[in-house]
Amino acid sequence: VAPLRGGYAFQSNQYANEGIPIVRISNILSDGSVGGEFVFHNELKDDEIFMLENGDIVLAMSGATTGKVSILSSEKSCKYYQNQRVGLFSKTATCNYSFVATIVRSEKFLEQLRDVLVAGAQPNVSAKDIDAFDFSVPKDVEEQSQIGNFFRTLDRLITLYQKKIDSSKEMKKILLKNMLI
Protein backbone atom coordinates (compact mmCIF):
# COMPACT_ATOMS: atom_id res chain seq x y z
CA VAL A 1 0.00 0.00 0.00
CA ALA A 2 2.75 2.43 1.02
CA PRO A 3 6.46 1.60 1.22
CA LEU A 4 7.79 1.19 4.76
CA ARG A 5 10.92 3.16 5.67
CA GLY A 6 13.13 2.13 8.58
CA GLY A 7 14.58 4.57 11.11
CA TYR A 8 18.02 5.57 12.35
CA ALA A 9 20.06 3.81 15.07
CA PHE A 10 20.53 6.68 17.53
CA GLN A 11 23.10 5.97 20.24
CA SER A 12 21.69 6.40 23.76
CA ASN A 13 24.89 8.13 24.92
CA GLN A 14 24.11 10.91 22.42
CA TYR A 15 20.64 11.69 23.82
CA ALA A 16 20.14 15.28 24.95
CA ASN A 17 17.88 16.96 27.52
CA GLU A 18 16.21 18.94 24.78
CA GLY A 19 16.20 19.13 21.02
CA ILE A 20 14.37 16.99 18.48
CA PRO A 21 12.16 14.29 20.08
CA ILE A 22 12.95 10.73 18.94
CA VAL A 23 9.98 8.44 18.30
CA ARG A 24 10.91 5.04 19.71
CA ILE A 25 8.83 1.86 19.88
CA SER A 26 7.80 2.81 23.44
CA ASN A 27 6.22 6.00 22.05
CA ILE A 28 3.84 4.06 19.79
CA LEU A 29 0.86 3.84 22.13
CA SER A 30 -1.93 1.28 22.10
CA ASP A 31 -4.59 3.99 21.68
CA GLY A 32 -3.23 4.76 18.21
CA SER A 33 -1.34 7.89 19.20
CA VAL A 34 2.33 8.71 19.62
CA GLY A 35 3.29 9.93 23.08
CA GLY A 36 4.76 9.07 26.45
CA GLU A 37 8.27 9.94 27.54
CA PHE A 38 10.45 11.07 24.65
CA VAL A 39 14.22 11.18 24.50
CA PHE A 40 15.85 13.96 22.51
CA HIS A 41 18.74 14.46 20.12
CA ASN A 42 20.43 17.61 18.91
CA GLU A 43 19.34 18.59 15.43
CA LEU A 44 21.39 16.87 12.77
CA LYS A 45 22.39 18.01 9.30
CA ASP A 46 20.84 16.06 6.41
CA ASP A 47 18.20 14.50 8.68
CA GLU A 48 15.44 14.13 6.04
CA ILE A 49 15.96 10.36 5.76
CA PHE A 50 14.85 9.78 9.38
CA MET A 51 12.63 12.80 10.01
CA LEU A 52 8.95 12.45 10.96
CA GLU A 53 6.20 15.05 10.75
CA ASN A 54 2.71 15.46 12.17
CA GLY A 55 0.29 13.07 10.51
CA ASP A 56 2.89 10.40 9.73
CA ILE A 57 1.84 6.77 10.27
CA VAL A 58 4.38 4.69 12.20
CA LEU A 59 4.65 0.98 13.01
CA ALA A 60 6.43 -0.87 15.83
CA MET A 61 8.66 -3.41 14.07
CA SER A 62 10.15 -5.26 17.09
CA GLY A 63 9.33 -6.48 20.55
CA ALA A 64 6.12 -7.30 22.36
CA THR A 65 4.28 -4.48 20.60
CA THR A 66 5.28 -5.47 17.05
CA GLY A 67 2.57 -4.42 14.62
CA LYS A 68 1.19 -1.60 16.74
CA VAL A 69 0.32 1.35 14.49
CA SER A 70 0.05 5.00 15.52
CA ILE A 71 -0.41 8.37 13.87
CA LEU A 72 1.93 11.16 14.91
CA SER A 73 -0.14 14.14 16.03
CA SER A 74 1.32 16.79 18.28
CA GLU A 75 1.26 20.54 18.70
CA LYS A 76 4.47 20.54 20.75
CA SER A 77 6.89 19.83 17.94
CA CYS A 78 6.56 19.87 14.18
CA LYS A 79 9.65 17.72 13.68
CA TYR A 80 10.57 14.33 15.13
CA TYR A 81 13.28 11.79 14.50
CA GLN A 82 12.48 8.17 13.65
CA ASN A 83 14.35 5.60 15.72
CA GLN A 84 15.53 2.25 14.40
CA ARG A 85 12.78 -0.46 14.32
CA VAL A 86 10.10 2.22 14.00
CA GLY A 87 8.68 1.99 10.49
CA LEU A 88 7.21 4.93 8.58
CA PHE A 89 4.60 4.34 5.91
CA SER A 90 5.88 6.64 3.15
CA LYS A 91 3.53 8.94 1.30
CA THR A 92 3.10 8.27 -2.42
CA ALA A 93 1.19 9.98 -5.22
CA THR A 94 -0.76 6.79 -5.98
CA CYS A 95 -2.12 6.17 -2.49
CA ASN A 96 -4.12 8.48 -0.23
CA TYR A 97 -2.59 8.64 3.25
CA SER A 98 -5.98 8.52 5.06
CA PHE A 99 -6.65 5.31 3.15
CA VAL A 100 -3.26 3.94 4.26
CA ALA A 101 -4.22 4.72 7.88
CA THR A 102 -7.42 2.71 7.40
CA ILE A 103 -5.64 -0.25 5.81
CA VAL A 104 -2.92 -0.56 8.47
CA ARG A 105 -5.55 -0.68 11.22
CA SER A 106 -7.60 -3.34 9.45
CA GLU A 107 -8.06 -7.00 10.36
CA LYS A 108 -6.59 -7.94 6.96
CA PHE A 109 -3.35 -6.12 7.87
CA LEU A 110 -3.23 -7.83 11.28
CA GLU A 111 -3.86 -11.27 9.73
CA GLN A 112 -0.95 -10.84 7.33
CA LEU A 113 1.21 -9.52 10.15
CA ARG A 114 0.50 -12.58 12.31
CA ASP A 115 1.46 -14.79 9.36
CA VAL A 116 4.96 -13.28 9.11
CA LEU A 117 5.77 -12.92 12.80
CA VAL A 118 8.20 -15.58 13.87
CA ALA A 119 7.54 -16.96 17.32
CA GLY A 120 10.54 -16.58 19.55
CA ALA A 121 12.12 -14.45 22.20
CA GLN A 122 11.43 -11.22 20.35
CA PRO A 123 8.97 -10.85 17.47
CA ASN A 124 10.27 -8.88 14.49
CA VAL A 125 8.88 -7.78 11.17
CA SER A 126 10.85 -6.31 8.28
CA ALA A 127 9.96 -3.59 5.81
CA LYS A 128 10.23 -6.25 3.09
CA ASP A 129 7.59 -8.36 4.89
CA ILE A 130 5.19 -5.42 5.22
CA ASP A 131 5.76 -4.24 1.64
CA ALA A 132 4.75 -7.73 0.43
CA PHE A 133 1.31 -7.56 2.11
CA ASP A 134 -1.58 -7.77 -0.35
CA PHE A 135 -4.65 -5.51 -0.31
CA SER A 136 -7.43 -4.57 -2.70
CA VAL A 137 -6.80 -0.90 -3.34
CA PRO A 138 -8.97 1.30 -5.56
CA LYS A 139 -6.85 2.85 -8.34
CA ASP A 140 -8.67 6.17 -8.03
CA VAL A 141 -6.95 8.25 -5.34
CA GLU A 142 -10.16 10.27 -4.81
CA GLU A 143 -12.06 7.06 -3.99
CA GLN A 144 -9.28 6.11 -1.56
CA SER A 145 -9.62 9.55 0.01
CA GLN A 146 -13.37 9.14 0.49
CA ILE A 147 -12.90 5.72 2.10
CA GLY A 148 -10.13 6.99 4.38
CA ASN A 149 -12.14 10.06 5.40
CA PHE A 150 -15.23 7.95 6.10
CA PHE A 151 -13.33 5.68 8.49
CA ARG A 152 -11.52 8.61 10.12
CA THR A 153 -14.91 10.23 10.82
CA LEU A 154 -16.23 6.92 12.16
CA ASP A 155 -13.18 6.57 14.45
CA ARG A 156 -13.74 10.10 15.79
CA LEU A 157 -17.40 9.28 16.51
CA ILE A 158 -16.41 6.08 18.31
CA THR A 159 -13.88 8.03 20.40
CA LEU A 160 -16.46 10.71 21.21
CA TYR A 161 -19.05 8.16 22.29
CA GLN A 162 -16.48 6.24 24.32
CA LYS A 163 -15.63 9.45 26.21
CA LYS A 164 -19.35 10.00 26.89
CA ILE A 165 -19.70 6.41 28.12
CA ASP A 166 -16.66 6.79 30.39
CA SER A 167 -18.01 10.08 31.75
CA SER A 168 -21.43 8.51 32.40
CA LYS A 169 -19.82 5.58 34.23
CA GLU A 170 -17.86 7.99 36.41
CA MET A 171 -21.01 9.99 37.17
CA LYS A 172 -22.86 6.78 38.09
CA LYS A 173 -20.04 5.78 40.43
CA ILE A 174 -20.11 9.17 42.17
CA LEU A 175 -23.92 9.16 42.45
CA LEU A 176 -23.97 5.65 43.90
CA LYS A 177 -21.24 6.55 46.37
CA ASN A 178 -23.10 9.69 47.52
CA MET A 179 -26.45 7.92 47.62
CA LEU A 180 -25.17 5.20 49.92
CA ILE A 181 -23.66 7.52 52.55
Protein language model features and the residues they cover:
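Feature detects amphipathic, helix-rich regulatory segments
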Residues: 1-181
